[in-house]
Curated annotation (Swiss-Prot):
Modified residues (Phosphoserine): S2
Topology versus the membrane: Lipid-anchor
GO molecular function: G protein activity; GDP binding; GTP binding; GTPase activity; myosin V binding; protein domain specific binding
Name used for this protein in its record: Ras-related protein Rab-27A
Catalysed conversion reaction: GTP + H2O = GDP + phosphate + H(+)
Effect of A76V: Abolishes interaction with SYTL2
Protein species of origin: Homo sapiens
Keywords of this entry: Acetylation, Disease variant, Disulfide bond, Endosome, Exocytosis, GTP-binding, Hydrolase, Lipoprotein, Lysosome, Membrane, Methylation, Nucleotide-binding, Phosphoprotein, Prenylation
Phenotype upon changing Q78L: GTP-locked. decreases interaction with DENND10
SMART domains cross-referenced by the UniProt entry: RAB, RAN, RAS, RHO
């Protein structure tokens, strides 16, 4: 796909404590490589990838492929950058929330990150996928899988155990997040909730046209 040759531009935000592997996960997804020498993200950075999304119907059949331009925003996890990070929450449509399976405090802080999202995202119930990263470091693991699953179930969000080192479940986690977003857009008659500048259609309904449907009903956010 050439520049501008897509149906939707969608922004995802990766967040979590410093050192959980956000940059490495996004780099593995976009470039298929692992770089162990990344320095700590200062402020905000992003990567991009083009994908084709095909929704599955109740009968299992897939519809026409939607061309998606993903912007994957990488945020600083340190507290001193928190005000800058939260300023980006409202413009993102989906959130990849990571913790480090070898760092219990990063897991305990997941609740704080979700609280921040509930306060600052485009709605109180945004689409989130929880990732326990560094699953390849099994001998250093301190967070049990059942603990992470229980937390994800408490908030009603999907959970994946990922590894930036070998790529385990990274594509699956991001594809799940994209699927949640596309299904949310499909079922919501009122598209006014969509963060401005995040979703754009080329050759289909414009965001202005989508906003004109406000009087027809609201999205259950």
């Amino acid at each position: 796909m050439s520049d501008g040759d897509y149906d939707y531009l969608i922004k995802f935000l990766a967040l979590g404590d410093s050192g959980v592997g956000k940059t490495s996960v996004l780099y593995q997804y976009t470039d298929g490589k692992f770089n162990s020498k990344f320095i700590t993200t200062v402020g905000i950075d992003f990567r991009e990838k083009r994908v084709v999304y095909r929704a599955s119907g109740p009968d299992g059949a897939t519809g026409r492929g939607q061309r998606i331009h993903l912007q994957l925003w990488d945020t600083a996890g340190q507290e001193r950058f928190r005000s800058l990070t939260t300023a980006f929450f409202r413009d993102a449509m989906g959130f990849l929330l990571l913790f480090d399976l070898t760092n219990e405090q990063s897991f305990l802080n997941v609740r704080n990150w979700i609280s921040q999202l509930q306060m600052h995202a485009y709605c109180e119930n945004p689409d989130i996928v929880l990732c326990g990263n560094k699953s390849d470091l099994e001998d250093q693991r301190v967070v049990k899988e059942e603990e992470a699953i229980a937390l994800a179930e408490k908030y009603g969000i999907p959970y994946f155990e990922t590894s930036a080192a070998n790529g385990t479940n990274i594509s699956q986690a991001i594809e799940m997040l994209l699927d949640l977003i596309m299904k949310r857009m499909e079922r919501c008659v009122d598209k006014s909730w969509i963060p401005e500048g995040v979703v754009r259609s080329n050759g289909h309904a414009s965001t202005d046209q989508l906003s004109e449907e406000k009087e027809k009903g609201a999205c259950g956010c």
